[in-house]
Amino acid sequence: MTKLTARQQQVFDLIRRAIERSGFPPTRAEIAAELGFSSPNAAEEHLRALARKGVIELAAGASRGIRLLGIDDAPHQFTLPHAGLMQLSLPLVGRVAAGSPILAQEHISQHYACDPALFTSKPDYLLKVRGLSMRDAGILDGDLLAVQKRTEAKDGQIIVARLGDDVTVKRLMRRPGGLELIAENPDYENIFVKAGSAEFALEGIAVGLIRSGEL
């Protein structure tokens, strides 16, 4: 890897940890808060320096559009836009009624045209986040979580799941005898789901996040 200053290495390591933990890079504001910068502009300067050194790639206009370069095993890389690439039209899912499919027409409030650079892989829909149970993963109330429909997920991935009549966003971990749905906020309890529970259904995995007000 190109030689980095100590501060640049801190920023690079923070980006990588965020991608490994949540599936998407941090925003400039999150980098600034984590590393004690005076403002997001200071984080932007370090990101541009890293881009000039060829270790990251930045997507213009995307607050989380950061891609690590030259790392074969880096998970959840963002695909940056190429010339002529079409925008994605994604349905926004609001409240979900008990017992009905998450993409049922009555749950879709509108559609958004989104830059593919915002996502780690192609999502199927956006889900409006309610509550702060995933706050420490950078997922806040009112954010739009990009979700790819899946019936399986890996340990550590952030998932969307049905739990009884509710739809929840949590981090998945397998435990003896079942699954643990982990909240990223100490004010919220984790949820244990027994193996084979009819109350649980995986709806998809998180592949990106749009901060409220960015669209």
Curated annotation (Swiss-Prot):
First and last residue of the signal peptide: none
Role, per record: Represses a number of genes involved in the response to DNA damage (SOS response), including recA and lexA. In the presence of single-stranded DNA, RecA interacts with LexA causing an autocatalytic cleavage which disrupts the DNA-binding part of LexA, leading to derepression of the SOS regulon and eventually DNA repair.
Entry keyword set: Autocatalytic cleavage, DNA damage, DNA repair, DNA replication, DNA-binding, Hydrolase, Repressor, SOS response, Transcription, Transcription regulation
Subunit structure: Homodimer.
Enzyme class name: hydrolase
Family stated for the protein in its record: Belongs to the peptidase S24 family.
GO molecular function ontology, one term from the record: DNA binding
Residues under site feature: Cleavage: A98, G99
One example of a Gene Ontology biological process annotation: negative regulation of DNA-templated transcription
Sections of the chain in a coiled coil: none
NCBIfam families tied to this protein: lexA
EC number(s) stated in the UniProt entry for this protein: 3.4.21.88
Name of this protein: LexA repressor
